[in-house]
Amino acid sequence: EWWKVGTMAARHWDALDALVRERDPYCRGAVILGLSQPVEQLIAGFAEARAPLVKGFMIGRTVWAGPSLAWLKGEIDDAGLQAQVAANFRRLIAGWRDSRPARATTAPEAAGALA
C-alpha cells in the first residue's frame, strides 16, 4: 500500500516515516500529492520531504489546471496549452530531482571511466 500525502514540514515527514515503520509493515512508501498547489510551492515542499519513506509525487491539477483555464478562456491555443503543461511538468521533475540526494551513477560510460 502507498500513503498519499500533501506537502508538509520535514519534522512531520520524519514523524510519519517513524510511524509507518512502526505500525504499517505493508506500506511501500509515500507519494506527495499536488492538490492544485502552485508549482513553486510544491517544489519547496519536495525539499522538506527528505524522509526515506517519500518515493515520489502524484500531480495533476498543479500541471494542467492553470493552462487549461487559459485555454478554455481562449487566451492560449492548443500549442500554448501543450507547451505550458509540458513546462510545468518539466519544472516539477527538475524540482524533484534537485531535492533528492545525489546518487552514484551506474551508467556504462561511468563504469568505463573507473577502469
Predicted regions span which residues?
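Catalytic-face loop-and-helix region of soluble metabolic enzyme cores
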Residues: A9-A102, A107
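Conserved mixed alpha/beta catalytic, RNA-binding, or beta-rich assembly cores of soluble enzyme
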Residues: E1, G6-A9
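Active-site loops and adjacent core secondary-structure elements that bind or stabilize anionic groups
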Residues: A107-A115
